[in-house]
Amino acid sequence: PAGPFRLPRCRKEFQQAQHLRACQQWLHKQARQSGSGPSPQGPQQRPPLLQQCCNELHQEEPLCVCPTLKGAAKAVKQQIQQQGQQHGQQGQQLQHEIRRIYQTATHLPKVCNIPQVQVCPFNKTMPGPS
């Protein structure tokens, strides 16, 4: 499956970055947290996990930041869907968590101060060509 990787080299970067493992953990954590979105944080208060995620993104070339993030978000979405089925979670709750994954992922480049990338243009549900 081509997934979000129309550029083969981004797929390679994604694999080299171990699928942005820290970013996946961070997205997973954010999706699971209830309450209103992330609190506005200066670089000083970045949780270590977020810092790791930012480091991973900084290693990508700018062109690949969004595709690799999209790949990470998709992986987390699948994890959450599987866990949701195991726990018999309501669809509503799952939808909510999945929305949060993409909300968080959309703004990661900005949170991480990635040069040239502010926001990844994920559309809300992102069926997209996968």
Curated annotation (Swiss-Prot):
Gene3D superfamilies xrefs: Plant lipid-transfer and hydrophobic proteins
MF (Gene Ontology): nutrient reservoir activity
Bias (Low complexity) ranges: 32-49
Pfam families assigned to the protein according to its UniProt record, in alphabetical order: Tryp_alpha_amyl
InterPro entries the record matches: Bifun_inhib/LTP/seed_sf, Bifunc_inhib/LTP/seed_store, Napin/2SS/CON
Keywords on record: Disulfide bond, Seed storage protein, Storage protein
Record function comment: Inhibits trypsin with a Ki of 7 x 10(-6) M.
PANTHER family: 2S SEED STORAGE PROTEIN 1-RELATED (PTHR35496:SF20)
Name of the molecule in the record: Trypsin inhibitor
The organism of origin for this protein: Mutarda arvensis
